Curated annotation (Swiss-Prot):
Name of the featured protein: Acidic phospholipase A2 5
Reactions catalysed according to its record: a 1,2-diacyl-sn-glycero-3-phosphocholine + H2O = a 1-acyl-sn-glycero-3-phosphocholine + a fatty acid + H(+)
Enzyme Commission number(s): 3.1.1.4
Binding site for Zn(2+) 2: 76
Active site: 53, 99
Principal subcellular localization: secreted
Biological processes annotated in GO: arachidonate secretion; fatty acid biosynthetic process; lipid catabolic process; phospholipid metabolic process; positive regulation of fibroblast proliferation
């Protein structure tokens, strides 16, 4: 898709590359019902990671003026371990933590090729 990528997506992408270096971040951009924030019932554990991430963003968005999809933050990747830095404000800290937890969740969830680019209308009611 040619939709413009939110700034923060670039950081989330780098976080995923930190925890799951063996896969392209694109593999996670269109997976299951929730990787891309959809609806319905998550198809598997990886999709549940995305559902939690979407809900996390929704909660962060309740902070006044916070748009987690666009919020940049400071973090560090060292040997596959992600750390959100202490100089983030409340919005940045929340956004960073949402992305950090999702990237860790992705690393621990099996990837099922059959759940990539699925028919959302048919499978996500």
């Amino acid at each position: 898709s040619n939709r413009p990528m939110p700034l923060n997506t670039y950081q989330f992408r780098n976080m995923i590359q930190c925890t799951v270096p063996s896969r392209s971040w694109w593999d996670f951009a269109d997976y299951g019902c929730y990787c891309g924030c959809g609806s319905g019932t998550p198809v598997d554990d990886l999709d549940r990671c995305c559902q939690v991430h979407c809900n996390c963003y929704r909660q962060a968005g309740e902070i006044s003026g916070c748009r987690p999809k666009f919020k940049t933050y400071t973090y560090e990747c060292s040997g596959g371990t992600l750390t959100c830095k202490g100089d983030n404000n409340a919005c940045a800290a929340s956004s960073c933590d949402c992305d950090r937890l999702a990237a860790i969740c992705f690393a621990g969830a099996p990837y099922n090729d059959n759940n990539y680019n699925i028919d959302l209308k048919a499978r996500c009611n």
